[in-house]
């Protein structure tokens, strides 16, 4: 039963090119990225955390609307951002902002990441996910999507090619890899992202930068799978940590 909210708030118009499609809809990470950017534009502050619910697929090549409303302004702020299409809310996010640039991250121990050159070029199936035309992936470790392995983990260097705002690109990176559950499967399944929470650290990666993504399915049942991911820059510095809920549509 579709219970998406009708009469969404007015906002700026946006039409996403079909090349950013993943399966039948616009990639969820791109949607989250636009919500992050809308919150930053409204507040003039730095997004530090986001929780987004993806309520319906966003159709490419069809006009959508992005709107943002402040719930709190100040040094610590909170912004509600929505993307709507066909008169209903398709995605909603609550974005925590801080009115200063992100400071250096202090970790208990330095984290070493393998060089980009260690990665093996891996191409997503462009007929199913045209966003592959914008995505360069260098896979690391033994696991591959639909490889029938024993560990539900995917690790890779990822680079996004495309003229995207930095926060929009970051959203795409948060959702760039297939579901890690695919590493232990041999057949594909429809597992769209329905929720994504991320904590953002350090400066947003520059356009076209390589980002290390280590993603693992922490648990799954017959209806959902939960993936945790860590994103790092080439120097090992933390970019973001994310958790997303994927809905298994075969039930």
Predicted features by range, described:
Residues 1-251:
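Terminal targeting signals and extreme-terminal segments of soluble enzymes
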């Amino acid at each position: 039963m579709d219970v998406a909210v009708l009469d969404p708030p007015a906002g700026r118009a946006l039409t996403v090119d079909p090349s950013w499609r993943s399966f039948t809809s616009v990639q969820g990470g791109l949607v989250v990225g636009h919500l992050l950017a809308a919150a930053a534009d409204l507040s003039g502050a730095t997004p530090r955390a986001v929780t987004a619910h993806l309520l319906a697929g966003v159709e490419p090549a069809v006009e959508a609307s992005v709107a943002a409303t402040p719930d709190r302004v100040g040094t610590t702020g909170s912004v509600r951002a929505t993307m709507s299409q066909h008169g209903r809310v398709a995605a909603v996010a609550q974005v925590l902002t801080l009115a200063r640039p992100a400071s250096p991250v202090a970790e208990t121990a330095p984290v070493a990441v393998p060089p980009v050159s260690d990665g093996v070029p891996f191409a997503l199936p462009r007929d199913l996910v045209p966003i592959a035309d914008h995505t360069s992936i260098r896979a690391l470790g033994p696991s591959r999507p639909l490889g029938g392995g024993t560990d539900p983990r995917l690790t890779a260097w990822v680079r996004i090619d495309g003229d995207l705002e930095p926060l929009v690109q970051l959203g795409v990176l948060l959702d760039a890899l297939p579901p890690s559950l695919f590493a232990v499967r041999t057949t594909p399944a429809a597992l769209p992202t329905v929720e994504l929470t991320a904590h953002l650290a350090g400066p947003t990666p520059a356009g076209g930068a390589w980002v290390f993504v280590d993603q693992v399915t922490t648990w799954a049942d017959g209806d959902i799978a939960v993936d945790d991911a860590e994103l790092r820059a080439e120097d090992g510095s933390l970019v973001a940590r994310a958790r997303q809920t994927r809905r298994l549509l075969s039930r």
